[in-house]
């Protein structure tokens, strides 16, 4: 019998599709998870900074205008903790607004500091049961008497000096933690630039080939995702600005520094807020990469939710009042609100009762994000995953069902 690396079937699937726990349908198609994690039902609504997010305690409706529209929930979290990065499809199939509490998220654990470099295999920690003892890094034990003094006339050899790792406060016998190239102390990026994002595709021969996503996977946007992210915010490899409509690149709103762990400050791009950053974005499933970058790379999302309504209103989302840092909730941005002067975006939060025009009755629905053709598996090896833009791309378009 031929062996396969396919993981066991994952619970979940698209909401309203077979296999979802709320539908009672047949088992969903098995989903391949590179990290071996199984999806859990959760939605990051409040952006909790202690646990990485909690399920909502109340149901928040999208409104009747969202009926029949697929949405892609992308949750971004700060760097430095094992935090769930959620992606979920939220199709609303009836005229009644469906709550976000019923959405299913595909959860992947975001590794903290000390990411493995590209090509380094993952090593499973050995069990403490039945393992041979670790050799004493301080040399052979010296014979002692009952007073714990060396016995007279017995030599056990000179004691070697302590290893270099021990002299710097590291546990003797432990290997130093391997950090990805380009990461500074505590696993943060050594500079304001982001490391390259590798989107990998298995060719069936045990090797993985790095490929950019196709146009179909990014909604027609032709930006090369790995190159654009590797070049840093708002820069392409040839140092030209990215097509961010009507925006000026600004640092990510977050704790003291971009990429610092929760409650700490450190190297990286400076930020404006003293609280940790957690941006939860609800995008349409067919949103282009340019729309995502225009929202996330400008650093306008501080805390809470932002919703890109149907139409082009979301393209000018960065000029709205999102950076006010309002408490958790869904921010529905109307076209009129999205065109406000950037100078007033910190004064008042947007209204949460927007009702944009409903989608056309005969308009085709976008494909399920989990089944986008051309989407590749994601192996978090050299991507810092501390940037909302990186998380949006990796959780949004590098996930596929097989």
UniProtKB/Swiss-Prot annotation:
Residues 356-367 have a biased composition (Pro residues). Residues 1-29, 109-255, 337-371 are annotated as: Disordered. Residues 345-355 have a biased composition (Low complexity). This is Proline-rich protein 25. It comes from Homo sapiens (Human).
């Amino acid at each position: 019998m031929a062996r396969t690396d396919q993981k066991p079937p994952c619970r979940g699937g698209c909401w309203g599709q077979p296999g979802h726990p709320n539908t009672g349908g047949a088992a969903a198609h098995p989903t391949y998870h590179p990290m071996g994690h199984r999806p859990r039902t959760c939605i990051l609504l409040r952006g909790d900074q202690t646990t990485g997010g909690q399920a909502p305690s109340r149901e928040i409706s999208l409104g009747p205008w969202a009926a029949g529209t697929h949405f892609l929930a992308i949750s971004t979290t700060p760097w430095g903790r094992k935090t769930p990065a959620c992606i979920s499809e939220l199709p609303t199939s009836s005229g009644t607004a469906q709550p976000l509490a019923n959405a299913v998220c595909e959860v992947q654990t975001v590794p903290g500091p000390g990411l493995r470099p590209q090509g380094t295999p993952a090593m499973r920690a050995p069990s403490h049961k039945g393992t041979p003892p670790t050799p004493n890094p301080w040399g052979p034990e010296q014979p002692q008497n009952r007073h714990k003094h060396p016995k007279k006339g017995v030599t056990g050899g000179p004691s070697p000096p302590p290893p270099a790792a021990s002299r710097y406060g590291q546990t003797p016998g432990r290997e130093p933690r391997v950090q990805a190239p380009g990461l500074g102390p505590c696993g943060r990026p050594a500079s304001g630039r982001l490391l390259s994002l590798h989107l990998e595709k298995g060719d069936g021969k045990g090797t993985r080939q790095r490929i950019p996503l196709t146009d179909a996977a990014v909604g027609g946007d032709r930006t090369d995702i790995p190159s654009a992210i590797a070049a840093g915010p708002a820069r392409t490899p040839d140092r030209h600005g990215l097509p961010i409509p009507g925006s000026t690149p600004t640092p990510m709103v977050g704790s003291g520094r971009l990429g610092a762990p929760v409650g700490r400050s450190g190297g990286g791009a400076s930020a404006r807020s003293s609280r940790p950053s957690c941006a939860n974005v609800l995008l349409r499933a067919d949103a282009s990469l340019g729309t995502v970058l225009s929202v996330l790379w400008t650093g306008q999302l501080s805390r809470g939710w932002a919703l890109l309504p149907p139409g082009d209103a979301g393209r000018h989302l960065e000029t709205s009042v999102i950076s006010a840092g309002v408490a958790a909730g869904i921010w529905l941005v109307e076209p009129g609100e999205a065109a406000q002067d950037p100078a007033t975006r910190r004064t008042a939060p947007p209204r949460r009762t927007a009702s944009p025009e409903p989608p056309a009755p005969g308009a085709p629905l976008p494909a399920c994000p989990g089944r986008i053709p051309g989407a590749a598996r994601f192996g978090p090896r050299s991507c810092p995953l501390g940037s909302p833009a990186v998380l949006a791309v990796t959780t949004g378009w590098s996930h596929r069902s097989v």
